Amino acid sequence: MKVIITVNYEEMSKKAAEIVKKQIKEKPNTVLGLATGSTPLGMYKHLIEMYKRGEIDFSNVITFNLDEYIGLSPDHPQSYHYFMFHNFFNHINIKKENVHIPNGIAEDLEEECRKYEEEIEKAGGIDLQILGIGINGHIGFNEPDESIETKTHVVTLTEKTINANKRFFKSAEEVPRKAITMGLGSIMKAKKIVLLASGKNKAEAIKETIKGQLTTKVPATVLALHPDVTIIIDKEAASLIPDEDLKEIEVIV
């Protein structure tokens, strides 16, 4: 596991974008696993700027998003489908048929999960998976106590996650109670993983992910079992990492 500490959110976002750019340069038909939420927004902004400067070509890139709320249509402003197109896909030259996001209004949700796994396999698996992390250590919508072998599945969101996401809605009551998410087993199949975190509210989850014991209570600790993980965090998210452990960490200021 490689850990990079940056001075702030902006530098974290820039570093993450550079890693994605390098991946696509090396493999133009890269399969990216993508995340939503406020954390990767800066990375998407930098990738759009790189595209506009002619530094990156998304025309052969394939993407799979981690998750989607159940019950929200793709055009709902709080759906992750809407988020991705509004904040990223509409601003680059990606082919719409190469974009994959779980369908939260599918008639048969179990079948939707099975098909999503099939599509990932058909694409050759995920080359580079981008992750955020919840304050309780969840990745995707894999909440505490999930099996580390799960594939794409339907989850019931915890009150903690609902409260964390209510800022995107008018009230907590409007936050969907269920979602489709790629499972921990699906995520761990990615060839490379980059996890992003920013802010003091993520510091405890980051400390546990980097130095804690492997436990389903903190889903992100499973990343210690993956052979190619890079964690990029700002100083605030790194604030609880013990000083003696900082010697092993790359710090970018």
UniProtKB/Swiss-Prot annotation:
Hydrolase as UniProt keyword: yes
Reaction equations catalysed: alpha-D-glucosamine 6-phosphate + H2O = beta-D-fructose 6-phosphate + NH4(+)
CDD domains documented for this protein: GlcN6P_deaminase
Keyword field contains DNA-binding: no
Alphabetical keyword list: Carbohydrate metabolism, Hydrolase
GO biological-process terms attached to the record: carbohydrate metabolic process; glucosamine catabolic process; N-acetylglucosamine catabolic process; N-acetylneuraminate catabolic process
Enzyme Commission no: 3.5.99.6
GO cellular component, as recorded: cytoplasm
Entry's Gene Ontology molecular function annotations: glucosamine-6-phosphate deaminase activity; identical protein binding
Membrane-crossing segments per the record: none
Pathway: Amino-sugar metabolism; N-acetylneuraminate degradation; D-fructose 6-phosphate from N-acetylneuraminate: step 5/5
Catalytic residue list: 67, 136, 138, 143
PANTHER family per UniProt: GLUCOSAMINE-6-PHOSPHATE ISOMERASE
Function: Catalyzes the reversible isomerization-deamination of glucosamine 6-phosphate (GlcN6P) to form fructose 6-phosphate (Fru6P) and ammonium ion.
Family: Belongs to the glucosamine/galactosamine-6-phosphate isomerase family. NagB subfamily.
Protein name: Glucosamine-6-phosphate deaminase
Gene source species: Thermoanaerobacter pseudethanolicus (strain ATCC 33223 / 39E) (Clostridium thermohydrosulfuricum)
Lineage: Bacteria, Bacillati, Bacillota, Clostridia, Thermoanaerobacterales
